[in-house]
């Protein structure tokens, strides 16, 4: 397969153009990664609907950005680290806090536990040991939170994999390395 490039507005179908128009309106541009997903309007529309639905879940915007940073670090996705570092800062995280989250070294016990759960799920193909899960419950999370966290991991892993498959240009300021 040839190198995948970021499609222009004219290269995607009408269903994808609807999503392009939406992002242009809310963000001023269509991020390169979402544009690339737009080669398949089905993939783009189903992904954006899935992520938008997660805004109604356990984790508010700031928490979701923290989760996205952890997942992207563990999956080695430079694009998503860049875009979600920018989003995390807009949602109240400092630069230092984003680095701590990514390294699993947040001073907040809740975030240490979330990091361990995410790391276990990613490294063990969905499994997490009893001790890890007991820690998740001990910081106040329930079954609904576990399902929401799993959904966020899956959604972010999708975009992480798209970037790692395509290596499209990163159109956000690069995240600081750990």
Give, region by region, the residue ranges found by the protein language model:
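Hydrophobic alpha-helical segments
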Residues: 1-178
């Amino acid at each position: 397969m040839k190198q995948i490039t970021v499609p222009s507005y004219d290269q995607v179908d009408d269903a994808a153009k609807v999503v392009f128009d939406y992002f242009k309106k809310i963000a001023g541009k269509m991020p390169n990664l979402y544009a690339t997903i737009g080669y398949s309007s089905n993939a783009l529309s189903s992904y954006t609907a899935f992520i938008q639905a997660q805004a109604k879940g356990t984790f508010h915007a700031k928490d979701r950005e923290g989760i996205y940073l952890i997942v992207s670090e563990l999956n080695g996705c430079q694009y998503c680290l860049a875009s979600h570092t920018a989003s995390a800062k807009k949602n109240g995280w400092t630069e230092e806090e984003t680095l701590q989250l990514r390294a699993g070294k947040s001073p907040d016990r809740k975030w240490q536990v979330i990091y361990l759960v995410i790391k276990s799920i990613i490294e063990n193909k969905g499994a997490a040991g009893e001790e890890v899960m007991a820690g998740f419950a001990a910081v106040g999370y329930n079954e609904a939170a576990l399902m929401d966290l799993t959904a966020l991991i899956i959604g972010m892993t999708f975009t992480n994999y798209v970037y790692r498959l395509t290596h499209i240009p990163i159109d956000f300021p690069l995240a600081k390395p750990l």
